[in-house]
Amino acid sequence: MRIAFLGTPAFAVAALDALDWAGHALVTVVAQPDRPAGRGQALREPATKAWARARGVPVLQPEKVRDGTLAAALRALAPDALVVAAYGRILGKDLLTLAPHGAINVHGSLLPRWRGAAPIQWAVAEGERETGVTIMQMDEGLDTGDVLLQRALEIREDDTSETLAPRLAALGGEALVEALRLLEAGAIVPVRQDAAQATLARILEKEDGRIAWTSPARRVSDRLRGFTPWPGAFTTLEGRTLKVLEARPGADAEAPAGEPGEAEVVPGRGLAVACGGGTALLVTRVQLEGRPAQSALDLANGLRRKRFRLGT
């Protein structure tokens, strides 16, 4: 097929690799514009743009996608299908319908669960043990189109959204190639989503990372894993931000007496922090505002205390 590809971050590169390997003709890669990044705020090109430039594939980076300009440019390339993977923009009907096979999306969840911008993060943060990828025929709704193909994937006990994303991306590439093959052969029957089963994976905000010590330790741990690397998990210690970098649910017997947020040194292991329901979170690595990352035990040694309160 002649494919016009729309995608921006590293997650989308696996789909490009799969399309290239399968012999599809990439007529263009459409990515978001270069954005300032890092401490120096230098312009950084999207991962998909770098992939395309290295292979001589034309790149488009429109500031606007709903004024008809992009649709006209793509129509002139006569693609058989648009493939969309984490592009980051809402597409209008003019784009969704310009190719014979329409627009095909690679989505990082088992739709209708986790429709929206952050499906990988929310699946982990909500403690789910399975997720997957959906190849979907796009419509004008938010991830509401008919399902063409799905593949499931286990969420491991120690997965973060950062470790899970590459595995989902690779699975998405494989599923995409299979779906396109079946689509060309007329062997796919689109399945309508059950809207009653839908959940929303809304855009993450910085405040989502603030730890609620009144939650059970398992929920705090799941949120830490889901929100790694951003927004991370953080609390306060005597008015200073304390990032919790590594932690896991501890034995309930380790929970310090007192209110949620009470922290106590567990010799040789870390800090046991009291959480909701009498549970304990064993914190092993942290970063206090203005300091480098360190073990939780080193933090306690520096404070010269074996017990203190977090969230203050």
UniProtKB/Swiss-Prot annotation:
<keyword id="KW-0808">Transferase</keyword>
<comment type="similarity">
    <text>Belongs to the Fmt family.</text>
</comment>
<feature type="binding site">
    <location>
        <begin position="109"/>
        <end position="112"/>
    </location>
    <ligand>
        <name>(6S)-5,6,7,8-tetrahydrofolate</name>
    </ligand>
</feature>
<dbReference type="InterPro" id="IPR037022">
    <property type="entry name" value="Formyl_trans_C_sf"/>
</dbReference>
<dbReference type="InterPro" id="IPR044135">
    <property type="entry name" value="Met-tRNA-FMT_C"/>
</dbReference>
<protein>
    <recommendedName>
        <fullName>Methionyl-tRNA formyltransferase</fullName>
        <ecNumber>2.1.2.9</ecNumber>
    </recommendedName>
</protein>
<dbReference type="Pfam" id="PF00551">
    <property type="entry name" value="Formyl_trans_N"/>
</dbReference>
<dbReference type="InterPro" id="IPR001555">
    <property type="entry name" value="GART_AS"/>
</dbReference>
<dbReference type="InterPro" id="IPR005794">
    <property type="entry name" value="Fmt"/>
</dbReference>
<dbReference type="InterPro" id="IPR041711">
    <property type="entry name" value="Met-tRNA-FMT_N"/>
</dbReference>
<dbReference type="GO" id="GO:0004479">
    <property type="term" value="F:methionyl-tRNA formyltransferase activity"/>
</dbReference>
<dbReference type="InterPro" id="IPR005793">
    <property type="entry name" value="Formyl_trans_C"/>
</dbReference>
<dbReference type="InterPro" id="IPR002376">
    <property type="entry name" value="Formyl_transf_N"/>
</dbReference>
<dbReference type="Pfam" id="PF02911">
    <property type="entry name" value="Formyl_trans_C"/>
</dbReference>
<keyword id="KW-0648">Protein biosynthesis</keyword>
<dbReference type="InterPro" id="IPR036477">
    <property type="entry name" value="Formyl_transf_N_sf"/>
</dbReference>
<comment type="function">
    <text>Attaches a formyl group to the free amino group of methionyl-tRNA(fMet). The formyl group appears to play a dual role in the initiator identity of N-formylmethionyl-tRNA by promoting its recognition by IF2 and preventing the misappropriation of this tRNA by the elongation apparatus.</text>
</comment>
<dbReference type="InterPro" id="IPR011034">
    <property type="entry name" value="Formyl_transferase-like_C_sf"/>
</dbReference>
<dbReference type="GO" id="GO:0005829">
    <property type="term" value="C:cytosol"/>
</dbReference>
